Amino acid sequence: MKRSYLKKIKYLLMLGISLLTVVSSVQSVLLARAPTGSFTHGYSGTAAEEAVSSRAVYAVSRLTDIRGMGIPEGIEKIADIATDDDGNFYLLTSDGRLFLLDGDFKLSKEYKITSADGEPLEITGARGILPMSSDDIYIADTENERVIEINGGGRVTREITKPDSRLIPEDFKFAPVKLERDSKGTLYVLCDGAYYGALLFSPSGEFSGFYGANTVKGSALTTLSYLWDALTKNDDKRAYSVKKLPYQFFDLSIDEKDFVYTCTGQTDNASSNGQIKKLSPNGVNILYKSKPDGTKTDAGSYNFGEASTEKRNNKTVVQNFTSIQTDERGYIYALDSTYGIIYVYDSESNLITAFGGGKGMQAGVFSAPEAIAYGRDKLAVADSQNNSVTVFSLTDYGRTLMSAQSKTLSADYKGSKSEWESVIREDSSNQLAMRGLAKAYFAEGDYKTAREYAKAGYDFVTYSQALGKTGSEFINKNFVWIFLLAVAVIGAAVIFTVEASKKKIVLIRNAKVRLLFNTVTHPFDSFNSIKYKNMGSLVIAAALTVLFYITAVISEMLSDFRFTSFSPLTSSAALQLVKTAGLVILFSVANWAVCVLMEGKGRLKEVFIVTAYATVPQIIYNLVFTLLSHIITSPSSTLLSGLSTAAAMLTGIVLTVGLMVIHEFSFPKFLGSILLTAFAMLLIIFIIFMLGMLLSQLWSFLVTVFMETAYR
């Protein structure tokens, strides 16, 4: 009976482990293969933006292949899709066949491309098209190293080849892939493998230089490597050295004001930032990213994709932004060809929506997305593998959202209010709508409601402005009572101080507790008493360590949202315990161990007491910070920064004096002990980490043995 009972337990445990393994495997497959749907980026208490599901701004309105479009079979893969100024869509294949599509994405016309003499023109490996109108079209004939311009009849009216210029290196290959033209008639040509930026051609076809090349991001390590090579290698060895080149632009788009937008596809596993740029006339990136605290940072340091992406063979599969479009309202559309995701950003780099993703044949996902084209609230995506086009149309929700955001960016808060309210009714978690409503209510003078929406939308600036207005109103209404209360408090404090001095009133009778507070004002005397008069208290030190942890948790949880990154989903009390109490204990053990070797006089108990007493300024700062965070109107307050610096300095001074006294060290010897203590702390952490790995492997081994035994 007992053996049967144990056998049942064994099989139940085996079944549980098997189910956990299967569930985790299925979950990982689903996460890797499922389409992303529509999402945006939002804040949830963390410093970084996170992907958040949202209502669809764009929805699939049509999915058609070449057969459905009425295009004859036998063509090569789709190379590009584009629109002209009239909203017509054009399709280019890699074998140089050009098709004009009507509003229903049916074949309206095929251009029979001929030379200027009327002879059929052979085009191979074409990769880009720029239709200005149905009678003026540019084609990037990549493999033939030329750009041709044709009229409505398909006849070539102009041909641009590699310019004869001293600005162009001898080994430069003129292989055009993408084309754009500004309002002045200047033609921008991107060439495959060119790191010099776009080639500029005047309206008459004359080469006028390069424009807007990416730059190589340097670092101290690359600088040292370059200097080392210069000192140790001869010319022959340097010739074989790998040179870091800037990433090339994959696509470009020009808006109505002739600003050039580019996208840069990443080709390695480095962290991706600045994939999208907005270039000024002199080629400088002027695109910026607005942050919740009101600051605007260079978008060159902003990741326009996702913070974390898939890994294959322990290597991160980076996102590849290979196609970009802009519209008349300043919105930016970018295609990530790696994951098939389309991103829509406003002029301040706020993500409006992202959609697509995944692999497959169903509507809304792609096998090999090649290019996107925008025209009149429609976004077409060409898939070169399926030879298909997916058309996304702006939804009513999306139209309202983008209209409201455009009005907010132009400071038309009153006009945007009703639209933002409509957005909130359909998507109550949309933070853009919350920020827009916060600005609208602030403009109306409803500061309380403005603060509520600003807090929900993580709009630090509007919240601070509304808080300042609310505080000013409160002070104006209650100035007399506030003044009388202040006078009463100050008077009571003065009277109590005088009476306490006369009558020698002692508030704290315990000498060891009084000594604790004297460590900040009289550290040498206090720590001498701890060392030579045994006035230190292990109980007080332990209580301070616990208080250090508790106040740190309070500060993280209860501080104003502008000053904390607390999130119930991501914050960990255990991590905070390690960062506070764990740090105190780790430092105490490491310093004691080091100082024993350096003939220090302090005992472990004394080191722990000194370290714990040194946390008093931090404990006070945590409480003061929590209180002031709800009063300070500026999210970048110099007052809080100053208090933080002062608390850190006081902690350092108390710790320095305390350790010098108990170990009887000179200052130089103390500095040496601190450096060795830091090394010892790292060593202890490494040992703990290794023990954790060994225990994890031991557990895996025991589970494997159990499974093998159970199956037998």
Q: What is each residue range found by the language model?
A:
Residues 552-580, 625-648, 685-712:
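Membrane-helix interface segments in multi-pass membrane proteins
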Residues 433, 466-467:
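TPR alpha-solenoid repeat register
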Residues 438-464:
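TPR/TPR-like (Sel1-like) alpha-helical repeat modules
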Residues 468-487:
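Juxtamembrane/start-of-transmembrane alpha-helix segments at the extracytoplasmic/lumenal side
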Residues 488-503:
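Alpha-helical transmembrane segments
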Residues 506-605:
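Selected alpha-helical membrane-embedding segments in polytopic membrane proteins
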Residues 587-690:
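Hydrophobic alpha-helical transmembrane segments and adjacent short intramembrane/lumenal linkers
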Residues 31-436, 457:
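Eukaryotic scaffold repeat domains enriched in small/polar residues
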